[in-house]
Amino acid sequence: MELLPPLPQSFLLLLLLPAKPAAGEDWQCPRTPYAASRDFDVKYVVPSFSAGGLVQAMVTYEGDRNESAVFVAIRNRLHVLGPDLKSVQSLATGPAGDPGCQTCAACGPGPHGPPGDTDTKVLVLDPALPALVSCGSSLQGRCFLHDLEPQGTAVHLAAPACLFSAHHNRPDDCPDCVASPLGTRVTVVEQGQASYFYVASSLDAAVAASFSPRSVSIRRLKADASGFAPGFVALSVLPKHLVSYSIEYVHSFHTGAFVYFLTVQPASVTDDPSALHTRLARLSATEPELGDYRELVLDCRFAPKRRRRGAPEGGQPYPVLRVAHSAPVGAQLATELSIAEGQEVLFGVFVTGKDGGPGVGPNSVVCAFPIDLLDTLIDEGVERCCESPVHPGLRRGLDFFQSPSFCPNPPGLEALSPNTSCRHFPLLVSSSFSRVDLFNGLLGPVQVTALYVTRLDNVTVAHMGTMDGRILQVELVRSLNYLLYVSNFSLGDSGQPVQRDVSRLGDHLLFASGDQVFQVPIQGPGCRHFLTCGRCLRAWHFMGCGWCGNMCGQQKECPGSWQQDHCPPKLTEFHPHSGPLRGSTRLTLCGSNFYLHPSGLVPEGTHQVTVGQSPCRPLPKDSSKLRPVPRKDFVEEFECELEPLGTQAVGPTNVSLTVTNMPPGKHFRVDGTSVLRGFSFMEPVLIAVQPLFGPRAGGTCLTLEGQSLSVGTSRAVLVNGTECLLARVSEGQLLCATPPGATVASVPLSLQVGGAQVPGSWTFQYREDPVVLSISPNCGYINSHITICGQHLTSAWHLVLSFHDGLRAVESRCERQLPEQQLCRLPEYVVRDPQGWVAGNLSARGDGAAGFTLPGFRFLPPPHPPSANLVPLKPEEHAIKFEYIGLGAVADCVGINVTVGGESCQHEFRGDMVVCPLPPSLQLGQDGAPLQVCVDGECHILGRVVRPGPDGVPQSTLLGILLPLLLLVAALATALVFSYWWRRKQLVLPPNLNDLASLDQTAGATPLPILYSGSDYRSGLALPAIDGLDSTTCVHGASFSDSEDESCVPLLRKESIQLRDLDSALLAEVKDVLIPHERVVTHSDRVIGKGHFGVVYHGEYIDQAQNRIQCAIKSLSRITEMQQVEAFLREGLLMRGLNHPNVLALIGIMLPPEGLPHVLLPYMCHGDLLQFIRSPQRNPTVKDLISFGLQVARGMEYLAEQKFVHRDLAARNCMLDESFTVKVADFGLARDILDREYYSVQQHRHARLPVKWMALESLQTYRFTTKSDVWSFGVLLWELLTRGAPPYRHIDPFDLTHFLAQGRRLPQPEYCPDSLYQVMQQCWEADPAVRPTFRVLVGEVEQIVSALLGDHYVQLPATYMNLGPSTSHEMNVRPEQPQFSPMPGNVRRPRPLSEPPRPT
């Protein structure tokens, strides 16, 4: 025993009550997402043109005299549009061979090739002429020249010129065959007075065989526009690689002294063709030569700032280029890229593969490659290859274009000739150029399909088209973790992908999507997607946004006042929403446009806040409370002190913020007023305080009750001027822990709200601290009494009793009694320890005073009074013996008094048996004397003690003797009639199933008499005789039944199974399970019951010590083959290994020399659970019934852990032993699911199925799992709570599957707690994966049992609940039997049967 030091003042209060911060403490303004300041669902309508077919190519022209045009090519047609996208001219480009083909006619009379549609592959401008050149997929890929003829601001096309000379072209050498049907990219460069076409085409074996295209070539346009000059330079994929090595040319452009092509191609001619990467090919724009052709691998990766687990070190690669564009960059991006402003940068959108499928990162990434750096890397690669010393083994590469070679040798040569230069041959630079995603993965799921980059002011903007037909205009920056959107809008409702090629015309970009061409302003389509004034005026200057009343727009869109210099403040929330009419309130305003500087400093006189008629004085911002706001969120806070004026009235009012004379910020100044409703002035009222006394140590939990106690932001409870620590604040109640007092005295107690005292006069009395000196006894059980002795025990409002087992603590409060002694009850605690009790510390505390702890306190299970009637005394007996489970274990903990007829007897305990010698002075009359047992002050009359006199026998005893005699006579008469009839049939029914083994197998099957569940010889009911096969006889075959109660068992005649025929290795393995048949005595006239697989007899087993042990013997009649016998023996070996208090153990298996196997099981004197709960003589409580289910759950949890599936869990298959412990039985035919996942009953076509206990999926698929056992457990709980009512009694078994599939389930029984019915519903979930496990069910049912206070929760009537009319065999009760009335009212608590026995 030890004394505990005093606790902190509020410790006990915090134990009893969950802590809750007072109103106003640490309140923060709700963050407004940054996305809330914009709306990307705003519809913008931009000019568009419908081309009449999928747009294949597009190019724009701007002349020197303000003439401009847009050229749009679709299949078989070329459109000429004006700058407003109005059609100016249309030209037929196909089909080839069609008389209406205008371009075909330019080549003279045909035929010029095979007929077919013309898909435009090349559409470029020759700026020198100027002229438009188009090349299609027909006519061997020839091109046509269209001179441009300006007509005002519009442009027309002259008659086309055919760039094809028949006499200069032949199949093996065709300089005028330019376009490939697989795709061609062309860039036109003016050199001197000539135009050179830099052409790159995708090839395969079929295209290469049709005419003579080239992969890369430089062709000069003839001056007479008759075609291209022969003898052009070219590179082509070698014929041996045409099948496996495909090159896609994505983009081409000209800048500075070079022309560049961007390709997607396999990484190597020897590797997997699907392993792609991106390359940049560079050609000289000043010399039409290919000797300085260079390639460089571009590497784009996504490398997040915080690398994900499992991600590669260098970031996730995105090797496939989807679209690219080059442009000069603005100052900000140039600084981040470490280049000069205005330098050209190549931007590319990359994906993970050809299909652009999602990876672990974003769908698309954007990388930037400065052109100067690209050229530098290429030049350095040339130096490494051609300048000494050359690294050995350095390859020239491009093996798909040329013969393999090592640097510095030319292709195909082993040495460099003096007349040749290493630099005059194509080269793949050995190093790659690597960059990371500019957007750091922020594009996320967006799939970018088009890209165009522009410089606006100092800002670099990427204009991107997406797979779903949207346009994103985003500022390109690297230093942010969010996207700076100029706009994000949809081009239309079709949602078709935006195509790769984008053209610019003046201040507009032309995007193509499906058959539409859209004209999008570079500055964005508008400003309406900005929703707040602050966001509107912070937009880029080039957008021209301004605030127009209550919306953002461009000046041309605003009919009223439009300005760009100021915004009003905006209130969105404030706290608190109420304040005291007297006293101050610290008011926090939330919103935007309060400040324009990060410091949040408010100049004097700029901000005015009024609440109703009362001013609110601005407070300086507390820098210690400043918290960083994520850039994706925004919120501003403003605090002021509100002190109501004397004229302020109680009630609701408005909060108003006015900002004037604020100095301008970077983008605008704040000026205006914002008003928000919802504040109320209230008058707090204190009505009651309790308790008004407590110990000097403090810690007393004060409860202050009243009205409007939570108004404002500050309140204080003062006890003698010292603050009482608040633990909970609500509108009607305050809870606090008193501070320590200096002396024993009465001190003032007051409440202040907002610094003003609430009217009322209260006094608190400090008393002497309670001192606990002892706690007794040192053991007990739930709700048993504990005595606390000490001094000043009534100084505390309540003493608290706490039990701690080392892991958790439970508490109960003691009611006030005497200052020196208090009687308390132990708290609720469930003992789960296998030893039957739990040791821990029992403590007593009084508020904040020092406590007392009793170590080593033993917590025991509560005792359970018996429910069986007392046995009459024999004449020679002078003591009463009765069983009282758990009473002996608690004898040292509580007071126990046993009386007979009001006279006390000197009782003694022998385990759970109580022996009570009768007092000598006791006279037992004819009606006997009542036996009463009082335990810890609670008394129960267990029955009446009677002793039969010599003059007569009590009527009840006489009936008990005569009724069995009459039943025996009736049984003998029935047996004689049956024997006579059987002899006439010349068949003898053997007395047990042993003799059936020798019957002739060809004789067929003979049915046994019907034995219903509970057809037990011990019940005194005779077995009905059979006169032939009646309507109850089973038809041999597959069938369904509600339960095995209604089944009959046919006996199969079969050949004898010899013990010597069994596998010797198996017999050796199961020798510990087998019991010699000489040690087993079967009482074949004592039938306990029957099942589908056999009959159960009462028997005896003689162990090795010659002790006769009662047992139940189950003879199996359905095993017909030797393999089944061997399988049964192996299963018996598994069953022998099961050991759990709630699982029926297997004594052994007896296999006679000739005959069928017999199973020996422990004898259960109380029979099965169904018979028990249906019996009118039993009176279990709700807690008893649920505890039976808890024991079943524990047994099933064990079987599930052992990987057994029961398949037939029901109340009829659970047994009760002499201590009323439930044992799960009839799992012997369960299948070990270690062998296979589930067991199919289709393997046993004669098995009768307990369909009304089966899970839905078992009814549908005939498969069983542990989760189908969980369903059956739910039905078993329903049986228990209805005391054995048949489930689905009005549903035909063949309709049950449809009934359950509709979601319908068994109704909630009348006395079933809601929490238990919820457990049943969880067991009946249609999806087996959603059902709980048995481990979870054990925990949930344990909680339900522990929540039922006491052992006797509700008195159940002895009549059956929820049962309609039924046959006698369904109820296991004859219809003529009288109903039993409820227990007499003077019986306070019947003997509960629920708790399993605990070892003492």
UniProtKB/Swiss-Prot annotation:
Which residue range or ranges hold the Protein kinase domain?
A: 1082-1345
- As given in the record, the signal peptide range reads 1-24
SMART domains associated with the record: IPT (SM00429), PSI (SM00423), Sema (SM00630), TyrKc (SM00219)
Catalysed transformations (reactions):
L-tyrosyl-[protein] + ATP = O-phospho-L-tyrosyl-[protein] + ADP + H(+)
Please state the Enzyme Commission number of this protein.
Answer: 2.7.10.1
Task: Write out the topological domains of type Cytoplasmic.
Answer: 979-1400
Q: Where is the IPT/TIG domain?
A: 569-671, 684-767, 770-860
Q: What class of enzyme is it?
A: transferase
- In the record, which positions carry Phosphotyrosine? Y1238, Y1239, Y1353, Y1360
Q: Which residues are glycosylated?
A: N66, N419, N458, N488, N654, N720, N841, N897
Transmembrane regions: 958-978
Q: Per the entry, what modulates this protein's activity? A: In its inactive state, the C-terminal tail interacts with the catalytic domain and inhibits the kinase activity. Upon ligand binding, the C-terminal tail is displaced and becomes phosphorylated, thus increasing the kinase activity.
Residues the entry annotates as binding ATP: 1088-1096, 1114, 1161-1164, 1212
Single GO biological process annotation from the record: signal transduction
Question: GO CC annotations?
Answer: cell surface; plasma membrane; receptor complex; stress fiber; vacuole
Instruction: Say yes or no: keyword Ribosomal protein present.
Output: no
Q: Which keywords belong to this entry?
A: ATP-binding, Cleavage on pair of basic residues, Disease variant, Disulfide bond, Glycoprotein, Immunity, Innate immunity, Kinase, Membrane, Nucleotide-binding, Phosphoprotein, Receptor, Repeat, Signal, Transferase, Transmembrane, Transmembrane helix, Tyrosine-protein kinase, Ubl conjugation
Task of the protein:
Receptor tyrosine kinase that transduces signals from the extracellular matrix into the cytoplasm by binding to MST1 ligand. Regulates many physiological processes including cell survival, migration and differentiation. Ligand binding at the cell surface induces autophosphorylation of RON on its intracellular domain that provides docking sites for downstream signaling molecules. Following activation by ligand, interacts with the PI3-kinase subunit PIK3R1, PLCG1 or the adapter GAB1.
Sequence similarity: Belongs to the protein kinase superfamily. Tyr protein kinase family.
Q: Which disease is it linked to?
A: Nasopharyngeal carcinoma, 3: A form of nasopharyngeal carcinoma, a malignant neoplasm that originates in the nasopharyngeal epithelium and includes 4 subtypes: keratinizing squamous cell, non-keratinizing, basaloid squamous cell, and papillary adenocarcinoma.
- Tell me how this protein assembles: Heterodimer of an alpha chain and a beta chain which are disulfide linked. Binds PLXNB1. Associates with and is negatively regulated by HYAL2. Interacts when phosphorylated with downstream effectors including PIK3R1, PCLG1, GRB2 and GAB1. Interacts with integrin beta1/ITGB1 in a ligand-independent fashion.
Q: By what name is this protein known? A: Macrophage-stimulating protein receptor
Species of the source: Homo sapiens
